[in-house]
Amino acid sequence: MALDKDIVGSIEFLEVVGLQGSTYLLKGPNGENVKLNQSEMNDDDELEVGEEYSFFIYPNRSGELFATQNMPDITKDKYDFAKVLKTDRDGARIDVGLPREVLVPWEDLPKVKSLWPQPGDHLLVTLRIDRENHMYGRLASESVVENMFTPVHDDNLKNEVIEAKPYRVLRIGSFLLSESGYKIFVHESERKAEPRLGESVQVRIIGHNDKGELNGSFLPLAHERLDDDGQVIFDLLVEYDGELPFWDKSSPEAIKEVFNMSKGSFKRAIGHLYKQKIINIETGKITLTKKGWSRIDSKE
C-alpha cells in the first residue's frame, strides 16, 4: 500500500500490459496495478501492449487505482483554483478535472459555517493522499502562497478594482489571490462584511508593502460613500430587486410612509445617487444601474 501512494495523485509513465473488455491494465514503476477505462483515453491515442504512456493516477472511492489521460487542473505537487460543486456535513466537494469529485474536509474549512464556500466558488487547493489511498483536497497555506504570488512594487494598481478570491479568512482580515497572481490583504477595518472562502469578489487596491503584497479595501472611496438617506433608498432598492415606484414627483406622504424622510431629503438623496451613477431616474420609478449592483457584488 505504501508503494501505491508514491504514484497516486501524480502524472507518471505506466506500461500497458493488457486489455480486459473495455479496460486497459497498466503497470506502475513499482509494480502497481492500475486500470484505465477507455472513456479516459485521448481520442487520437491508440495504446499498444508493452508501450509506456503518460497518465494521471487517482484512487476510486474504495482506494483502487485508476488512470486517465485527461490531465486534471491540480496534482499533489501543483496548486490551482478548483470549482466547488457542493457542500455537505463532510466539507466541500470540488471539481479538479477528474471523473470523480474530491472532498476538502470540514476540519480544513472556516469554523464559522457562513464563511464556507458555496457551489460555484473556487478554492485554492492541491491533492492530498492518505495512507489508505484516499484522495482529498488540501487548502493552500500562507507559506505556499508566499512562493507563488506575483509581487507588485509600484502604485500602478492603486485605486484599481480587481477580482480576487479569498484563500484564507480570519477575523483580522481577508487574504486573497487574483487570477494574475496578486496577493491581497484586506484588513477588517476595510470591509463591512466578511467574504466566503473562495468567493469571487471585487477589491479596490489601496497600496502595497515591501514584499510586493497588495493592500485592499471592500469599501468605496470616501466621496462615493452614501449618506444615511441615500443608504436607506439603496437598501430598499436592493430588497425590491433594483426597482421602486418612486421618483422626484412622488407625493410627500407616500415618500414619508415608505422612506421615513421628507420629500426634500428624498430628492436630494436620489439626485446624489443619480450623479454617482448608482441609480437611473425614470418616469414613475427609480432603478439600480450596473454600477449600483456592483456595490453589492463587491460588498460595499
From Swiss-Prot:
UniProt cross-references to Gene3D superfamilies, sorted A to Z: Nucleic acid-binding proteins, Winged helix-like DNA-binding domain superfamily/Winged helix DNA-binding domain
Q: Give the top-rank taxon of the lineage listed in the UniProt record for this protein.
A: Bacteria
Provide this UniProt record's keywords sorted from A to Z. Answer: Virulence
Database matches in PANTHER family? CONSERVED VIRULENCE FACTOR B
Tell me, in a sentence or two, what this protein's role is. Answer: Contributes to the expression of virulence factors and to pathogenicity. Involved in the production of hemolysin, DNase, protease and protein A.
Q: Which family does it belong to?
A: Belongs to the CvfB family.
Report what the protein is called.
Conserved virulence factor B
Q: Which organism is it from?
A: Staphylococcus aureus (strain bovine RF122 / ET3-1)
